[in-house]
Amino acid sequence: MYHQIFHVGNIIFYILLAVCGVLLIQKIIYHIFGLFPSKRFPDAKKDHKYAIIIPARNESKVIAGLLDSIKNQNYNKDLLKTFVVVEQESDPTCEICKNYENVEVFVRKHLENKGKGYALDEVIKHIFASNEKYEAFFICDADNVLDKNFIMEMNKCFDMGYKLCLGYRNSKNWNGGWVASCSALTFSMINTFQNKSKARFNRNVVVSGTGFYIASDILEELGGWDFCTLTEDYEISTYSTLHNIKSTYNEYAEYYDEQPTSLKTSWNQRLRWCKGYSQVNKKYNKKLIKSVIFDREKRLNKFEYVFSILPVMGLIATTILYTLFTFVLAIVGSFIGSAYAWPVWRAFITVVGAMYLFFVLYSMVMLIAERKHTNITMKNSLICCLMSPFYWASYVPIYVTAMFKRTVEWKPIIHKVQMSDDGKTSVEATLEEGVEKK
């Protein structure tokens, strides 16, 4: 009986594994094409006018780095205006902004609405009311630093008619510890194995964090910034897919931000992402599925956006369930003295070892693919690869925990790295990050 249970469990596992493998062919193709160089966008025929919006509550220790990088852009400065959003006039950020041209400080009035999305909505409505005309809005976090060609590269995409475009998200602190390097590696995966390939196949890309622009006519139609879930970036991506908004990704428009260095900070950050992901799916998935069925325009793009995650989730769930199945069965077998207990233990060790080895090799491939962008040392590369399976495995309890989190409070999180104009880093900075509360 014991052996039969193990045998049936194996059969079910291999069948589900095969099904998930077939359904993952599209993802595998994307990964392969992600290893090839990105396409270069042609030079723009016109320099367009942009507003750069920076939510910057209590960000006086980092805001200068971003404003300096904006000042040093290889772009017509008369076509750029920066809006820094604060909550109080006494914020030291306001004094720093006075040292820069074409920078306006906007003080929020409706502080009862907490969150980045509401801050963006206030300032954008203020801009619309002032009758200042901009063709698109760039969204940046205060701790970001832009490569000198960032806006020039993004302008190429806008000039080609893309209403939404994101740049290449790089990290300031690849060598800031295993948590920071694993976090940075996650964005490398999104950059290279997802958005690069999506752009190549003219699929809608997924915005991650900041470093993107959105055309002003979209926000004018909405009457402001209408994306106020916990993950406004993912919400924008979903909205653009639903409404057939043309989006792309430009690898050569590079910007930098800092990754968390402690597991606790990273946990809280990813907790917000997981909960926000659920919020957006709840808000948009029914509309997307309905659009897939009844709207012929970009039907395949929408179908892929909604359902492409299912094989991945299925593979993860199948592997976790089989691991738990063999672990429990092995313990029971050892307790009752079954002769088949060792084969079950061997199956458990094999599947856990295979998962670990897969993620180690996957991380190695990503680091090799991203070697031109990273400054990570060989030692830290090795540590990153060895620890990445634990980092990604932690998403499972994080996602489960997110289901029981209800309210959000914004708390300061210490950052330690600020980039100078020569690309070097120094230990200073703070940023705000959303932390879930039970």
Predicted regions and their residues:
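Acidic helix N-cap motif at the loop->helix transition within catalytic regions
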Residues: 64, 91-99, 107, 116, ...
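Short, acidic, metal-binding catalytic loop of nucleotide-sugar glycosyltransferases
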Residues: 68-79
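N-proximal low-complexity "stem/linker" segments adjacent to membrane-targeting elements
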Residues: 1-69
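Long helical/loop segments within the catalytic core of UDP-sugar-dependent glycosyltransferases
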Residues: 109, 113-130, 149-230, 267, ...
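Acidic donor-binding/catalytic loop of UDP-sugar-dependent glycosyltransferases
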Residues: 92, 140-157
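Juxtamembrane C-terminal module of membrane proteins
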Residues: 31-48, 287-302, 329-438
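Cell-envelope/extracellular polymer assembly enzymes that use nucleotide-activated donors
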Residues: 48-51, 81, 235
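A conserved acidic beta->alpha catalytic loop
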Residues: 86-94, 110-112, 145
